[in-house]
Amino acid sequence: CSEVCVVAVISCSLQSKLEAAKENGIPVVAFDSGVTDSKMVRAFRGTDNTRVGEIAAYRLATAIGKMGKVAVFSAQEKTQSIQERVSGFTNYITNYPDIEVVEIVYQDQVDDMTAAMQEVLDKYPQLDGVFCDNADIADLYLDMKKDETKDSIVMVGVDATAKQQEAIWNSKEVGVVSQQPYAMGYQTIWTALLTTAPKKSVEIKRNVRIDPAWIDSSNIDDPTYSSYLYAN
């Protein structure tokens, strides 16, 4: 094996494998999430997840008139990419003093995420908006059976899944902050190939963060953004 590309949900989950790669002189390129800060990783290629949260905060704040109550429905609390999205969102939303983040719910901290989200909707009948910070949570929220009084809640999601694209077309979701999986994969493989070159012949930038894009009804059919749309 001459090089390894890895993605970790939780940064500590690959520690032993990273140590083994280092001992055997195998360069490691991390992509997407999980091990960006490890000294055992030669390079990282992935989305700027802090920016994902910031864009979501700006778009949600704008959509609800820069005032009101919002909730964050999140995935694994220990996942680095999710941590960055949540912190990006909560830090940016402080620019709007009339907006209150009333709840942050993590899927790995509850027994039933659908029930937990419904509990938030029931607890805050005047909730104005929600940020679903990954594709699975967004799709789960869209699948929930909600009464008509909840139709006015503004939703912003992450990654333009087929279900979220349909929700945007049907005005059930204001928009989605989407990653570009092709660019992420291309950058990762290209960087892995560069690690096989003589050390002094190429310069490999340690961290490359790929900007996400905002997708809504105004640009979802624009071919320019087709690489940000997911088939499933």
Which residue stretches match the model-derived regions?
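Short, solvent-exposed amphipathic alpha-helices that sit
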Residues: 52-59, 80-100, 116, 140, ...
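Second-shell loop/turn segments in exported
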Residues: 40-47, 76-79, 102-105, 126-128, ...
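Hydrophobic alpha-helical
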Residues: 2-23, 28, 89, 102, ...
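Flexible loop/hinge segments that line or gate small-molecule binding clefts
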Residues: 12-51, 69, 161-174
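Hydrophobic alpha-helical segments within soluble ligand-binding/sensing domains
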Residues: 45-70, 113-114, 160-164, 180-200
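Short beta-strand segments enriched in small/hydrophobic residues
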Residues: 3, 8, 42-43, 69-77
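Hinge/cleft segment of the Venus flytrap/periplasmic-binding protein
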Residues: 92-96, 186-232
